[in-house]
Amino acid sequence: MQPKKSIKCLADMPVMPLTIGTMEWNQTGTWRYLTPTASNKIPPCRSNCPAGMPIPDFINALKAKGDAQALSVVMRQNPLPGLTGRLCYHPCQPKCIRREHDSPIQIQRLERYVSNCDLIESHAIAEKGTGNIAVIGAGPIGLACAYFLGVNGFEVTVMDAGQEAGGALLKVSVEKLDPKVRADEIDRMVAIAGLNLNLGQTDLAASLTIIENSYDIVVVDPTSVGHVQQKPLNPDNFDPLSSTSIVTKKIVVTLPEKLIPFKPGMIAHYIGIGHLTANHISALMKKDPALSCGIIDLSEHVAKDCVRLVDGGPAASAPLKVSREKEWSEEQAMVEAERCLSCGTCNECGQCVQYCPEVSIQIHDGLEFDLFHCKGCGICAYECPRGVIMMEEAKA
């Protein structure tokens, strides 16, 4: 046996062949029969949200960019987060996968914390184009419908007989909802969507014919308060939960029995119905049937066994024994946000990059796969703790 040689510097190295080139020329991707693809899936919390809230997205935005960006993400699907953060029965939380490890994320409290941000412009609004729409009734359905039409570029006027917007929300007790919070939430969404708000229109019932002739579409909100509901515009009633399209330009939104009479705890349902109604109207006005689809595509759910804890993350804290009105501090919100597993949503954790043996993955505003060198081993999909990466058969 030859004695061990101590190598202290480069000069001590024995003579050997050495290449200073790279292996980029060797496109090992031709060996691949499975191809990695990355696409966000629908997590259990979002699939159980009547308003279709992008829950992991807004929590990731809160952690990375702060409450203003998080609120911007929230308001893409929910124009009244301060109300859902206080009134909603939060069906999202019982579905949280984290509950199997310790306790579910307190999503409602995070939403409430984010809603307290002073934000006027939340996201880009489409340029106002053709289409003049009237929404009769400033209840939660009418406001939500008007908001989503407004941010999609339609000119929308909301009319109500009351002196204050809110409709059935005005009847919610002060103990459950501070009137200032309600007013601030409505003012913010009206400003963001560029809505025209005409209140105190006590003669709406008598003016229906004039309104019909002045607007392309007229929507009647069943959650508003006023006499106009008793004198519909003689259209076919429209149920956004079961109808596939709008067949008339004068519609009265109908509600399922479980939402009658108005129930504050079901606020997310009313917002979701307003959103669906706006989608159908957009499809009619833009002659694009694809726009009339639901709020979220329920066919792409994340597989439960694809989501797992990597390092445990922050453990569940003891339930906060605070009054209903007490707000969370930034520290409390961040601690709770860090517990989110981001199920089905890539948060650029870098796990796939770390384990890829071919160094074929990069992160640039999302995942990029170098398919010239990826061999399709599937390690990235196995190691992804969010269930985002899937392996598909390579097409010939």
Model-assigned labels for residue ranges:
Residues 1-124, 220-375, 379-396:
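Ferredoxin-type iron-sulfur electron-transfer modules and their immediate structural context
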Residues 32, 44-45, 132-133, 140, ...:
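Short, contiguous strand/loop micro-motifs
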Residues 117-131, 165-177:
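Accessory recognition modules or surfaces
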